[in-house]
A protein has these predicted regions:
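N-terminal leader/targeting and accessory segments in enzymes
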Residues: 2-111, 115, 410, 473
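Short beta-strand "acidic-cap" motif of Rossmann-like dinucleotide-binding folds
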Residues: 47-51, 158, 180, 257, ...
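Nucleotide phosphate-binding/pyrophosphate-handling subdomain across enzymes
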Residues: 15-23, 34-43, 288-395, 413
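Phosphate-binding loop of NTP-binding sites
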Residues: 4, 39-42, 79-81, 90-239, ...
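Residue-level signal for inorganic ion chemistry
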Residues: 40, 86, 128, 161, ...
Length: 477
């Protein structure tokens, strides 16, 4: 029986039985909002969806909405406060006046993740979080579990922050499904009860501080991924991350450590490590040695260690893991080749929305000062100074764009030349005008995309389109 846990408002955790006769409010008509509204409507709930954007901006999205769902657009009216519970979109601040009033009125607010999982029948949940690497790791782990599920006659889904809402995958009809979920701090902070069989925290460095308000609050959000596990569950942690080591004392489940350090093999507590370019796993009293996926950088070796170790904990066989590794393709927008123009190699790393991600990308760049670095977007409140050593070692010049440009220039112009561009298209043109064959142009923004783009995917695709346009122009000339 599930424990009686509470949410901010003091209400019980979400259970379909308890809330069945209460009207559901869904705040936001994004992917997760539409998906959870449809899920609830399909389960017989009365659903009211409220969206602050105008009808013109969300009309296409609403076409996918169940016809029984009531809607309002262009703002939130008092009708939202007549509902029995609410489901909010990820990223909506708890300082939002509507959320504050909901809590004051005693109306519980849940995440799409928690509500969706409440309808899943006996799922095997593997949940992945971390500041960086969670998309690659989730996709890798999801591919392993698809192969494993096929041998068990079960279904497998990869969902969450990768763009596939949990609610869209959960139909409640598949018993014993394997669900691999990438969960952001936004999603976790609103989940009062999730209990993965396997939880994964890859690393924790400053990010989303403008949303959470402090590093402490950000860490507390991440910890929710394991807080409700028990001794029969597993928690996979990065032994080289100091915050992971510190929080391990709060983990109620069995901890499995992975490490990329040179002496990891000598430490008996380490369950997965790298030796001679191979991945070594120690689990269940056995030792397995696998070839890593064909991906650049030590960070991807770490991602593979985490994915493989998690899969073993979930019952996958070494051969299944190896098959997934052998066939794994790079994640879009993460150190992704975008094209070559005038001998300059352009790299799309639009998913790098924080400084630590940029550090990972820079480590994968060629030696010597051959890299042009495009930074900028909406500032997230973390310093850019940690970039200085690698910038001085590898970066020829920085091109800044977006709202954060003045802040970036203030912190980094003393160690490398900085030029400001009106947008990323102009940034590409500046590099083509000043660079030379053999250089690399790395688009790794270190900022969110919301100043000019829908999301990092939109930003990355626009960047690739610009590079293609410039390459096509070169061929025509």
């Amino acid at each position: 029986m599930k424990p009686e846990l509470t949410y901010r408002s003091g209400e019980k955790m979400f259970t379909p039985e308890y809330f069945k006769n209460k009207k559901a409010l869904v705040i936001g008509a994004g992917k997760s909002g539409i998906a959870v509204a449809n899920l609830l409507a399909g389960k017989g709930f009365r659903v009211f969806l409220s969206e602050s954007a105008s009808l013109d901006k969300v009309r296409d999205r609403l076409k996918d909405l169940d016809s029984s769902v009531e809607t309002e657009t262009g703002g939130h009216t008092d009708a939202v406060f007549s509902c029995g519970f609410a489901v909010k979109c990820p990223g909506l601040s708890h300082k939002n006046p509507v959320l504050i009033r909901l809590e004051q009125n005693g109306i519980p607010v849940f995440s799409e993740v928690e509500v969706a999982l409440a309808f899943a029948r006996s799922p095997h949940l593997l949940a992945v979080t971390g500041t960086n690497g969670k998309t690659t790791t989730s996709m890798m782990l999801g591919e392993i579990m698809k192969i494993h599920a096929a041998t068990c006659g079960a279904a497998a889904f990869t969902v969450g922050n990768i763009g596939n809402p949990v609610a869209a995958a959960v139909c409640g009809e598949d018993t014993g499904s394997f669900i691999t979920a990438e969960l952001s701090s936004y999603q976790l902070e609103d989940s009062s009860f999730i209990k993965p069989e396997v939880s994964v925290i890859l690393n924790i460095t400053p990010d989303h501080l403008e949303h959470h308000g402090s590093m402490e609050a950000y860490i507390e959000a991440k910890k929710r991924i394991f807080l409700f596990q028990n001794k029969n569950c597993f928690c996979v942690l990065n032994h080289e991350d100091p915050i992971c080591r510190k929080m391990s004392s709060d983990v109620p489940s069995e901890i499995l450590w992975f490490s990329s350090s040179d002496n990891a093999e000598e430490r008996c507590e380490i369950n997965a490590f790298i030796k001679n370019g191979l991945l070594v796993f120690r689990h269940g009293g056995k030792k397995f040695i696998l070839n890593p996926p064909d991906l650049p950088g030590i960070h991807n070796m770490e991602n593979a260690l985490a994915a493989g170790l998690s899969a073993l904990a979930a019952g996958a066989m070494p051969g299944e893991i190896q098959r997934a590794f052998d066939n794994f393709k790079p994640v879009e927008h993460r150190i992704e080749p975008a094209g070559i123009v005038k001998g300059i190699k352009f790299i799309n790393d639009s998913k790098a929305t924080n400084v630590d991600s940029v550090l990972v990308a820079l480590k994968a760049m060629p030696a010597g000062k051959k890299t042009w670095l495009i930074l900028g977007g909406r500032d997230k409140g973390a310093p850019y100074s940690p970039l200085v050593p690698l910038v001085m070692e590898k970066v020829k010049s920085i091109i800044t764009t977006g709202e954060a440009a003045p802040v970036i220039e203030k912190e980094l112009s003393s160690c490398v030349s900085c030029k400001r561009a009106a947008d990323i298209y102009e940034a590409c043109r500046i590099i083509l005008a000043s660079g030379k064959a053999g250089d690399t142009a790395l688009f790794s923004p270190a900022c969110s995309s919301f100043d000019c783009f829908k999301d990092y995917e939109d930003r990355g695709r626009r960047f690739k389109a610009y590079v293609k346009e410039l390459a096509d122009g070169e061929r025509q000339n």
